[in-house]
């Protein structure tokens, strides 16, 4: 059994600027994860952009974890993971897999972020992420925790991104 989240954010920036000037900017990514989300690590491991704007990127991330005891018992106090993804410019869609540093065969996270123009200098971002934890007795608890962290981080991301855009307009 898995847990899926679908959420939408709106920003006062064009879809193209959000994608290329923010989301795939190493400066913005590091600031977002380290300052905005409180992660202890954000390292861009690889970044490849073709002439046709197809992008492949890998980030190594270490989030702050305020996990319940059953989750901490299984995952530990900290969790590091690699986010490996690919951007398709024809659909403005970022598709990614999250590979945790521990229990990668038992914990799977896959997601998509689709960016669409929603007016002059406005965009809407549709997020869909699925958490699948195959650990008897605690899998569902860990999935719910991961989904809750995703929701919280998306709220923080919205505030941080809005401030970033406002300060640079």
Predicted regions, residues:
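Hydrophobic pocket/interface hotspot
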Residues: 18-20, 127, 161
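Glycine-rich portal/gate segments that line the openings of hydrophobic small-molecule binding cavities
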Residues: 43-98
